[in-house]
Design a protein with these regions (language model features):
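Extended, hydrophobic alpha-helical segments in both membrane/secreted and soluble proteins
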Residues: 189, 311-328, 332-340, 347-348
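Carboxylate/His-rich catalytic cores and anion/metal-binding grooves
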Residues: 2-4, 87-151, 156, 198-262, ...
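Short, compositionally stereotyped local motifs that mark structural "simplifiers"
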Residues: 1-91, 96-112
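Surface-exposed patches in mature extracellular/periplasmic domains of secreted proteins
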Residues: 198-203, 282-285, 326
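Short, compositionally biased leader-like segments
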Residues: 49-66, 158, 162-179
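ATP-dependent phospho-/nucleotidyl transfer catalytic cores
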Residues: 145-172, 209, 215-319, 328-331
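Short consensus segments that form the blades of beta-propeller domains
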Residues: 80-86, 121-123, 326-330
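A conserved alpha-helical element in kinase catalytic cores
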Residues: 172-194
Length: 348
């Protein structure tokens, strides 16, 4: 159990000379390190007070973890961001720090942490996202906390701390960096009446050292479906694109199931390859007869309204790395999920 006390006025000048703080390495694995904020900004009276205000403006997470579990050549998951699965999970303490305005009351929970992401796992990126798993072996089986407010889920088997990659300071200081695009798109989809991962933005400290802004986000797997669509976890099929960087192996971009199986998705994919100007083919996808009445012999495999609204969000948000990826020469998809409860007649 940990209880952290962070004083932003002391943290703003961390590693002003670019050198690592105590117990941190100069580099990790094949990756490159980047510590602290730019001293040219933090020491500038024009920006310093604004930075201090920003560190108080939103709540903060704190991770307490053995440094070697992140940075050592033998066991460090940050040094080997391309590691996947349980072998790449390390125990830690995760805190959401209480705020003086009581916007957050905070929590502490022991968890397993992994690196998350695809392309962003490459060693050339100095900033990686995190995924936290709540298991009996660490303590509580679930995180029970009102992370997102409103009628959002209050119980979680895992959560993500995402960081932008394609358009971000740590990827060529890209001038297109917005940081909010993905969550804005998810919020739009939710506003259009569809289940969508809730999220917010929080600061992160690792062992007391400032690590940047991260996007807390739900992961749309079976537990998400149970929370927002209803039903049992084991009744959900969830599919996504697998790809990105993996240390020691090649990961091609292809669809695979994170929960359940691929049977219904494969059937939907097969139907989508047909001539959909043929009314019968389209009707098979949405489980109706040509007259629009329910077909008891056919299962609804697609929610067309959800798909249409999703594509509107993609176009409006200018997302170039989702159902069709510009980074893949517009020849394939990336960064999407499909979710369906097999016992309900709603489709993916």
């Amino acid at each position: 159990v940990t209880r952290s006390y962070i004083f932003p006025a002391d943290r703003i000048d961390d590693s002003a000379d670019g050198l690592p703080p105590a117990n941190y390495p100069y580099d990790w694995g094949a990756g490159k390190s980047n510590y602290g904020m730019d001293a040219g900004i933090t020491s500038n009276p024009k920006y310093r007070e604004k930075l201090l205000e920003a560190l108080w403006a939103i709540p903060s997470y704190s991770i307490a973890i053995e440094p070697e579990n992140l940075f050592s050549d033998e066991t460090g998951i940050y040094a080997h961001a391309g590691w996947h699965g349980r072998k790449a999970e390390r125990n830690c303490s995760l805190e959401l720090l209480p705020t003086i305005d009581e916007q957050e009351h905070g929590f502490q929970i022991n968890a397993g942490v992994r690196i998350r992401g695809g392309f962003s796992r490459q060693p050339k990126f100095p900033k990686h996202g995190f995924r936290f798993f709540f298991r009996r072996r660490y303590g509580a089986k679930r995180l029970k906390y009102d992370l997102f407010g409103g009628n959002a889920a209050k119980e979680f088997s895992h959560i993500d701390l995402r960081c932008s990659q394609n358009y971000a300071w740590h990827h060529g200081f890209n001038p297109k960096a917005l940081y909010m695009r993905d969550q804005f798109n998810r919020d739009l989809q939710f506003a259009m009446g569809h289940p969508s991962p809730r999220g917010n933005f929080r600061h992160l400290y690792i062992n007391g050292h400032y690590w940047g802004i991260f996007n807390t986000c739900e992961r749309p797997k079976a537990f998400f479906g149970k929370s927002y669509i209803g039903g049992k976890k084991e009744n959900f099929d969830v599919v996504k694109i697998m790809g990105g960087y993996s240390e020691g192996s090649r990961r091609t971009y292809q669809v695979f199931p994170t929960d359940g199986n691929m049977d219904l998705w494969a059937r939907l994919d097969e139907l989508s390859q047909r001539d959909l100007s043929d009314l019968n083919a389209y009707c098979q996808m949405i489980g109706v007869k040509p007259d629009g009445s329910r077909d008891p012999k056919s299962k609804r495999l697609l929610d067309p309204v959800n798909l249409i609204d999703y594509m509107l969000v993609i176009f409006y948000g200018g997302n170039l790395d989702a159902p069709i990826s510009w980074f893949g020469n517009n020849r394939g998809g990336n960064n999407w999920y499909g979710l369906m409860n097999r016992t309900q007649n709603k489709g993916f």
